Amino acid sequence: MVLYIIGLGLGDEKDVTIKGFEAIKKSSKIYLEAYTSLLGGSTSIEALEKFYEKKIIIADREMVESGCEEMLKESTENDVSFLVVGDPFGATTHTDLVIRAKELSIPVKVIHNASIMNAIGCCGLQLYSYGQTISMVFFTETTKPDSWYDRVKINRVNGMHTLCLLDIKVKEQSIENMCRGRLIYEPPRFMTVNQCIEQLLEIEEIRKEKVYDQDTLCIGLSRVGQDDQQIISGTMKELLDVDFGAPLHSFIICGDMHFIEKEYFETFRVKKN
């Protein structure tokens, strides 16, 4: 029997590939990973179930990170599909799942799809001109991680663009509830372009290494791959007050731009009052 790990792409239920759709149709159970990304726009679990004509089981953080025992056991007897928004290998969790399956001698077939890592080309910056991608997590009163700053610095020195993947908090517990063993979860939170810029500038103010400033050119994107996709370019200062709408958001710190990239950049330039 086979464990299929299937990318759903970035849009709605119809973004699944034909190969992925066929695997879903012949699987006895369908799981949807529901915490490293978000289904596009107004797409609901019900919409997926109607399109696939299959019942979908939500695989939350606890289930996936605890080893997916139930799903793996099922895969030893029947074909099972594990659905991932974007591409299957957009998160290390899914790599770990493949390793677990191989340890149990369960055949794994991965069916790829579009992810933010390649769809980001929609902004006009050439994919081979990107440096290291960084993840920007929500700051707290006590924690302000800045290890990403050094990677941005390397990218900037080399004239490379930096893609910033913005934090998602789904089914997260507060420290108090975690310590007390209470399964009470915080409301979902999705970092915005504005919050990302604020945190970038805050760390620059602390580190003072002049890696970037409020006049650095950048691009904010929201809902990439969906019908209401939004792309706006400008300086950090200009984008700080732009409303990018509903999640998911992504952010790019521009490096040195080819003249064609510059032309494309200007087509998305923020409108000034």
Curated annotation (Swiss-Prot):
GO terms for cellular component: plasma membrane. Its EC number is 2.1.1.314. GO terms for molecular function: diphthine methyl ester synthase activity; transferase activity. This is Diphthine methyl ester synthase. Belongs to the diphthine synthase family. S-adenosyl-L-methionine binds at residues 10, 87, 90, 115-116, 166, 224, 249. The gene is dph5. Pathway: Protein modification; peptidyl-diphthamide biosynthesis. GO terms for biological process: methylation; protein histidyl modification to diphthamide. It catalyses: 2-[(3S)-amino-3-carboxypropyl]-L-histidyl-[translation elongation factor 2] + 4 S-adenosyl-L-methionine = diphthine methyl ester-[translation elongation factor 2] + 4 S-adenosyl-L-homocysteine + 3 H(+). Keywords: Methyltransferase, S-adenosyl-L-methionine, Transferase.
